[in-house]
Amino acid sequence: TISESSKGLNKFVDSHRNLTRVAAPVKKAFYFKGLAERVINLTREQTIMSGAICTYVEKSEDVLLYADEGQITQILINLVKNAVQAEAKNIEITAEINLSEHIIINVTNDGNPISKESQEEIFVPFFTTKQEGTGIGLSLSRQIMRLHNGSLSLTKSDDHSTVFTLIFR
């Protein structure tokens, strides 16, 4: 009906508006462990309802991040929700500092892999493989990481696991 089309179009326009207006990050120093634990708590109901478990593993001690905590929380919640929607049962967030002093955060899940065709498109605004999706989550997340002079990429997706990597330089 016209009403449904109108609602869909409004949703699209709102999504586009949100995508094009990412606020400049308000950065401060914080320990990543606290943020990871908050993300796990914020997504707990959704993970439990789907039979999944989300955990945090600190591979380097006391990972201190200088970033916009709210924006990074938004990225991680999006990645956890995507994992749940991909029918993951195990979702793991890890953080480490590499030899170049970059902070590497991985979000790994054992859900359905992302098809080779979709891997090329998942960061394109409004691309979605989901019935209810808007296709802005990953695009917005990548934009936020760029504003942090970092990157967000899909580093692996096969029958065993899917891994998204955030790198803070």
Task: Describe the function of each predicted region.
Residues 1-22, 29-46:
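Conserved DHp (HisKA) dimerization/phosphotransfer helix of two-component histidine kinases, i.e.
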Residues 22-25, 64-67, 129:
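Conserved micro-motifs of the catalytic ATP-binding
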Residues 53-63:
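Conserved catalytic submotifs in the C-terminal HATPase_c
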Residues 90-101:
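Short beta-strand/loop element within the Bergerat-fold HATPase_c
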Residues 114-126:
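Short conserved segment of the HATPase_c
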Residues 137, 141:
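Short alpha-helical Gxxx[C/S/T] motif in the catalytic ATP-binding
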Residues 145-146:
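Detector for a conserved hydrophobic position within an alpha-helical segment of the HATPase_c
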